[in-house]
Amino acid sequence: IIIATIKSWNIENAKILQKQHLGIHEIKIIDNKEEFVLEKIKSFQPDIIFIPHWSYIIPKEIYENYKCVVFHMTDLPFGRGGSPLQNLIVRGYKETKISAIKVTKEIDAGPIYLKECLDLSGSAEDIFKRASDVIFSKMIPKFLLEDIVPCEQDGDIVSFKRRTPAESELKEEMDMETISDYIR
């Protein structure tokens, strides 16, 4: 098993998972882009690669040769694309689902293995940490215990664009709740 992530809260949870599965599963943690290359992946020969938070394009030669599962913070096919948390908050959502999907050529369009609910209250960091806890305590363990068959995404596709700093500028006409959502 490989876990590829760049966020500290995911790295911490991956290390906990490593300890919990010592002697059961060999888990390698990759926390930088330079290590996430085919040659290094080949040397480890993983059965599955989990990608809980990765800000880079996943190389085609990796997802075509290995089972790669990415975790996306929307109820797909709603919310494909960049800045999912920020886009949900700006649209007033109070909860979402984390979708575990098969990595394919098209971003966030792969078949869905499973989904879990996620509360969007608190700061962005609180939400990311809560998402990490859901991924590592509920979702990844299901993969390790069951043979989950993914299903094609069903429903209307709604795509998000990566938000820019200019889109997060405060405006005079905003009410307090909107301002709170912009700065959390």
Q: Which residue stretches match the model-derived regions?
A:
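One-carbon transfer enzymes
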Residues: 1-184
